[in-house]
Amino acid sequence: MAQAMASMTGLSQGVLPSRRADSRTRTAVVIVRASAEGDAVAQAGRRAVIGLVATGIVGGALSQAARAETVKTIKIGAPPPPSGGLPGTLNSDQARDFDLPLKERFYLQPLPPAEAAARVKTSAQDIINLKPLIDKKAWPYVQNDLRLRASYLRYDLKTVIASKPKEEKKSLKELTGKLFSTIDDLDHAAKIKSTPEAEKYFAATKDALGDVLAKLG
């Protein structure tokens, strides 16, 4: 009996070390496999990054070459002449000419005296046509249109007056001074949104316009 127990004890002691060795071997194999798989994944990632970088470099080189070809095909001529010489653009460069005083940088196209007189009549009619806006109390529109037409009117009247003989200039200047005084009063009435004042100065402006147009003939 004792011998049997001893033999079993010896057998168990011999089996345990062998099992431990097997488990250690398996663990080592798993570690080696995991390390190999990790290296493979890292290598694949590096290859993908290198491929993307190479693609970007090639694409950039191709796009630069295409742009260079496009630039070669664009024909650049001489700069355009000042003011272009087209109708309505004779003073187009004056607004950008910083050597000129601000008041001399026109945004209105200068016209010959006869054409300026015709535009005076058009601007006068546009001012008279503001009456419906006054009746509707559309004050911002009244102010904007009045100021726009008055700027044309002032500019063209200066052109017309400058072309008149000396004896006619004085009377025309007096009439235009009265006209723009009433226009300023009408603008102020629209600013304060006063219907009675607007109607009063609109009538005065209309009469002053009639006097100026009659003088121009």
From Swiss-Prot:
The GO molecular function terms of this record are:
calcium ion binding; electron transporter, transferring electrons within the cyclic electron transport pathway of photosynthesis activity
Pfam families assigned = PsbQ
What's any GO biological process attached to this entry?
photosynthetic electron transport chain
The alphabetical list of record keywords is: Chloroplast, Membrane, Photosynthesis, Photosystem II, Plastid, Thylakoid, Transit peptide
What does UniProt give as GO cellular component? chloroplast; chloroplast thylakoid membrane; extrinsic component of membrane; photosystem II oxygen evolving complex
Which SUPFAM superfamilies did the record assign?
Oxygen-evolving enhancer protein 3
Subcellular localization is given as:
Plastid, Chloroplast thylakoid membrane
Q: Which domain of life is it from?
A: Eukaryota
Location of the transit peptide in the chain: 1-68
| Keyword Membrane (UniProt) | yes
Sorted alphabetically, which PANTHER family does this protein's record hold?
A: OXYGEN-EVOLVING ENHANCER PROTEIN 3-1, CHLOROPLASTIC
By sequence similarity, the record places it as follows: Belongs to the PsbQ family.
Protein's recorded name: Oxygen-evolving enhancer protein 3-1, chloroplastic
Q: Which organism is it from?
A: Zea mays (Maize)
